[in-house]
Structures are given as C-alpha cells and as structure tokens.
Amino acid sequence: LSIAEGHIDDVLREVPGAAAARTLVGLAGTVSCAAAIEIGLADYDRDRIHHFRLSRAAVEDVFRTLATETRAERLENPGMEEARADVIIGGMAILVKVMRQMGFDECLVSESDILDGLVASQQA
C-alpha cells in the first residue's frame, strides 16, 4: 500500500492545478460501487447514484469494511458487482488517499464520463 501511496503522491504533484481543486468528482467504477454500497442499493439505479455525495467518512468506512472481508463476503454487500470484487480495494485505497491528501470532505459521484461530454459538445 505504501508503494501505491508513493506513486499517487508523484502523480498528484504532476497534475497542474490539482492543489487548487475545490471539488472531487468520481466517475463510474469504484466510486459508483462505493456509493451503491453506502446507500445499500442492491439493484443499480443511475438516478440514485448520479450526483450522490460520498463523504470522506463514508469512503473510509466502506474501504475499511471491504478491506477486511473475503471476496465472498464482499459480494454479499448490496451494490457490489462480481467483476469489481477483486479490484475494489485498490480503487478504494486510491480514493481514500486522494481525499485525505487533497483535503476533500466529499466526492461527487458522476455516472457521466468523457464520452457524454464529447457527445454534448458536438450537439451544441
């Protein structure tokens, strides 16, 4: 974990303007899964996930819980996708580190991504 944290430190130093960021937006994947687990959402519902605000305390709680569970136990969490059960801990470790280091108290969950932005810009 300390090797990953060192790498994250390096990446954050290289991102222009990262220190001045005021809002953390997390896209899909780990962040959406963490939100679903926090909500207790067994069946995916984009409307409940999109724009959900995950507090740092919730992120750390979900991380601690998942990190102490076996794969089988992780799969019992409402919202945990089978394909994500093996990789979620790494993604959560990154999210926790970024939130702590950058001082974010919450992460805004977005189910939109760069492709949505590209389509919207072409329609404008």
Indicate residue ranges for each PLM-predicted region.
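Helical "lid/coupling" subdomains associated with nucleotide-phosphate turnover
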Residues: 1-124
